[in-house]
Amino acid sequence: MEQLSAANTRFAVDLFLTLTEHNPAGNIFISPFSISSALAMVFLGARGDTAAQMSKALHFEGVEIHSGFQSLNADINKCGAPYTLKLANRLFGEKSYDFLPEFLASTQEMYSAELASVDFLRAPEDARKTINAWVKEQTGGKIPELLASGMVDSLTKLVLVNAIYFKGKWQEKFMVEATKDAPFRLNKKETKTVKMMYQKKKFPFGYIKDLKCRVLELPYEGKDLSMVILLPDDIQDEATGLKKIEQQLTLEKLREWTRPESLDLLEVRVQLPRFKLEESYDLQEPLARLGVRDLFSSKADLSGMSGAKDLFISKVVHKSVVDVNEEGTEAAAATGAIAEFAMLVPEEEFVADHPFIFFIRHKPSSNILFLGRLSSP
């Protein structure tokens, strides 16, 4: 499981950085875990060069993938958790294709994923509506339209859909009455007014000296999940001020910055904007830049999925929504006890009034469920 978590984090960082290249200053929000998990399902049926390209981009070499995802999904979606986290994957295939029974059995067993047959050939618009209705249901209504009109047509053979929905409450809630209007600096020149939440409590807090960057961990109820925020002291470059951090982002660095030894439980005065992000991605181009090329063309070898040789993935659409407020976080994406001592604790300031990087992680497995950059609340 540890190897799989490392692979997923490497892929998360790679994909995030690929998206930042094309979008150096805007908001970004993805669920890398759900994208990895959805692609792993396709990987079950990939062979030859297609499988090799996927394995390399997803860092799957030498990793127990399918049984790993099976136990990881069970661990993260566990019953009785104080949060709601629902991961749902499904392949929608053209109904005139015959899919291999062993592939269908494997996806069901490992990913609890059905293959739904739809009539792309004769009724693509009905197929699109069927897919959207399923995603809407799986995300508690947060993502009502994953596929826009015209996204599928009569040539579509296979669409990979993945949705993840998260709703968690902060362990330490922000008091609504403490929220005030405050300026948020978008860059060195522009500001906008936001609803700034405030609280003073003990949180795991760290400082990365060479990056001049603060690290704050805000746990959710139950402590299995937390949001980690990387906030530079100031805007250093001409865009969001996050270039320096983005240039150093790797699995190893992330682990080093956020491991328990790097963070101290300190009294922190936290100012964090209330924000909601809703981002949509067609992942074909970013995945191609990471080396997954054949999957989306007639070169694809998905012979482990169907006897047909002309099967390829038409679309990988990922849409994610996160809503951060005083109570906690609602995010949807379609992709030990501490002894406390009474003593005078130095106070730290954490004023998130300019762009920052944040991620929501599942601590027991070290998986990054969501990863984003807030440039403009």
Curated annotation (Swiss-Prot):
Tell me if Endoplasmic reticulum is a UniProt keyword of this record.
no
Where does it live in the cell? Secreted; Cytoplasm; Cytolytic granule; Early endosome
Segments for region (CARD-binding motif (CBM)):
349-377
An example Gene Ontology biological process: negative regulation of interleukin-1 beta production
**Matching SMART domains, A to Z?**
SERPIN
- The secretion signal range is none
Which residues does this entry mark as bearing N-acetylmethionine? M1
Site (Reactive bond): which residue positions? A342, M343
Secreted in keyword set: yes
Keyword vocabulary terms for this entry: Acetylation, Cytoplasm, Disulfide bond, Endosome, Lysosome, Phosphoprotein, Protease inhibitor, Secreted, Serine protease inhibitor
One Pfam entry name: Serpin
Q: For the modification N6-acetyllysine, which residues carry it?
A: K136
Phosphoserine: residues carrying this PTM = S298
Name where it mostly resides: secreted
PANTHER family per the UniProt record, alphabetical: LEUKOCYTE ELASTASE INHIBITOR, SERINE PROTEASE INHIBITOR, SERPIN
This chain's function reads: Neutrophil serine protease inhibitor that plays an essential role in the regulation of the innate immune response, inflammation and cellular homeostasis. Acts primarily to protect the cell from proteases released in the cytoplasm during stress or infection. These proteases are important in killing microbes but when released from granules, these potent enzymes also destroy host proteins and contribute to mortality. Regulates the activity of the neutrophil proteases elastase, cathepsin G, proteinase-3, chymase, chymotrypsin, and kallikrein-3.
The UniProt similarity line reads: Belongs to the serpin family. Ov-serpin subfamily.
- Self-association or partners: how does it assemble? Monomer. Interacts (via C-terminus) with CASP1; CASP4 (via CARD domain) and CASP5; these interactions regulate the activity of inflammatory caspases. Interacts with PRTN3. Interacts with GZMH.
Please report the name of this protein according to its UniProt entry.
Answer: Leukocyte elastase inhibitor
Please give the organism: Bos taurus (Bovine)
Its lineage reads: Eukaryota, Metazoa, Chordata, Craniata, Vertebrata
